[in-house]
């Protein structure tokens, strides 16, 4: 194990699971219910390729100038970017859905959601780093494990920086008793399985993506916020 300077990081193709996860809306500022949503079954759908960072999630970031759709499927409602919801629904194998309304990203700010397996609020925030290249336009945000995440959360001083991974790359008790002691790679599988069991897993796909690696040992890099 070693700390790396930014110049010592190189990108390499890395096979991984990409997962889509449902975060239940607990406060919609009255805006989604106006479109007909049942708040007990309304979710922001996030997408991530680093499942092990989900215990550190405490925000969902949207693009302030993007349009977001409220998509109804059966009796559930999903908030996703207008440009991306079709690919997400396809990944989930969901058909027969309809768009019941649209809303600007800036109007989603300060809505609240419930973390899918930790007793914690995940606040909806806005950031200019959000893109429409992949995912759902609703970015899983863990300021303890990502530079963009950390930087955008500086605009929201009430959002804590949670780092449930120790210096050896193992999950701590803060990740939850079910995952404590697991390596990050073990946690990827365990968390995905838990999400599936609890109904919070929206979809999962195998992909190959560009991920930062150590230029010396060629192993994937683990990002942690430190003092």
Regions found by a protein language model. Give the residues of each.
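Substrate/cofactor-recognition hotspot
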Residues: 125
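Residue patterns forming the tRNA-binding/recognition surfaces of aminoacyl-tRNA synthetases
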Residues: 1-55, 67-69, 107-114, 120-121, ...
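Short beta-strand-to-turn element immediately C-terminal to the catalytic PLP-Schiff-base lysine
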Residues: 61-63
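Carboxylate/His-rich catalytic cores and anion/metal-binding grooves
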Residues: 68-112
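A short, polar/proline- and glycine-enriched secondary-structure boundary/capping micro-motif
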Residues: 56, 88-92, 184
